[in-house]
């Protein structure tokens, strides 16, 4: 693990009362304002063990038409808790130098995407929500800003730190569900779950008649 200063925010500043659990789409802008106002930069090794702080992680999903980019982490991943896991998200820690020259978290997110992924098409970015999961040691010290990158090209491949990647439909991704990292499972359940989508479509169709 690198000994670098990363962006963190005190838990009590993010959650003055009870912390929500899961992926929440509402209130994203308010939390971003808190992050910008209360952000600190502290040594990563210390923060991995300090639950008084949340490490802010932009977590980017790539989508092309009806397919999402599913990746598998290397067994040599720097965080041993995530090795060999499958992931829907591209992300990482933010350092002080990453946010220089007036750059935003979103600017950093696009740079991080292009550092890890070889992709030459156009991208449209949108915010899906904030993800919090205190049910395990990894999630307890991290907070995810979940972003969706929609591309106009299917030509995409892994550049660094991740082992493999492929574009799959939600139904195909479901086969890997047990091996998805926890954040990706939460996102799958909230957004991609084909059974949930099918029920919503059936409900919408029945309301037409």
Regions found by a protein language model. Name each.
Residues 1, 51-54, 139-141:
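A short catalytic or substrate-binding loop motif that flags glycine-/basic-rich loops and adjacent residues
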Residues 21-67, 73-77:
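Acidic, metal-coordinating catalytic segment for phosphate/diphosphate chemistry
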Residues 115, 119:
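Acidic, glycine-rich loop-and-strand cores that form catalytic or ligand-binding grooves
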Residues 14-20:
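Short N-terminal binding/cap micro-motifs at the start of the first secondary-structure element
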Residues 7-12, 44, 84-97, 129-134, ...:
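Nudix hydrolase/Nudix homology domain
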Residues 67-112:
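Conserved Nudix-box catalytic region and its N-terminal flanking loop in Nudix hydrolases
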Residues 120-129:
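A short coil-to-beta-strand element that immediately follows conserved catalytic motifs
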Residues 2-6:
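Extreme N-terminal starter segment of soluble prokaryotic enzymes
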